[in-house]
């Protein structure tokens, strides 16, 4: 399942649970996260850190000496079913300003509808563009200057997502990239287009 620190995955069509890495879409979660323009962000991923370390043990050195028990990475993104929203999620500057948000907190900090999410399934297909660990495979050239501050968690290709949620990055060809701060104080999420 590993290729130079990568763990490729697809999605299971099975009942999710709170201990799984989940990707989906929920706009009705508790403790709303708000963009600078007042728009409520959508919860698009839930990553329990202990589960991440089980699936991708290469992260253990990054989390060494960190308190991560019962913590999760929450990924929020600008989403609008009725209107164009791609510009809000493709610029790193917009992500830094809060049009997307990564929060590391208690596993129960946000109550959300778990049935709107799909658990990941680690696989051995090395051609998949959705994976945990390793280095990001950008669709467009991206400056790595900002990477020193972050740990790359993984990337998700829209077309790998189940049909019900495959437009959370606006187009299925788009890829979302998840990073966390090295001190676990938050992170960065943005999308690239082809």
Which role fits each region the language model picked out?
Residues 1-194:
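Preference for intrinsically disordered or flexible, low-complexity segments
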């Amino acid at each position: 399942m590993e290729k130079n620190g990568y763990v490729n995955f697809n999605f299971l069509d099975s009942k999710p649970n709170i201990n799984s890495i989940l990707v989906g879409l929920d706009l009705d979660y508790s403790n709303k996260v708000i963009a600078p323009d007042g728009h409520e962000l959508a919860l698009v991923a839930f990553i329990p850190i202990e589960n991440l370390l089980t699936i991708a043990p290469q992260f253990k050195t990054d989390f060494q000496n960190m308190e991560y028990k019962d913590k999760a990475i929450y990924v929020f993104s600008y989403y609008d079913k009725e209107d164009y929203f791609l510009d809000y999620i493709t610029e790193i500057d917009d992500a830094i300003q809060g049009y997307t948000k990564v929060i590391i907190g208690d596993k129960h900090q946000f109550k959300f509808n778990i049935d709107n999410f799909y658990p990941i399934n680690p696989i051995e297909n090395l051609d998949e563009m959705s994976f945990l660990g390793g280095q990001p495979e950008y669709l467009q050239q991206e400056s790595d200057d900002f990477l020193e501050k972050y740990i790359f968690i993984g990337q998700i290709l829209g077309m790998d997502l189940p049909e019900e949620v495959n437009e959370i990055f606006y187009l299925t060809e788009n890829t979302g990239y998840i990073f966390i701060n090295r001190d676990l104080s938050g992170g960065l999420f943005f999308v690239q287009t082809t």
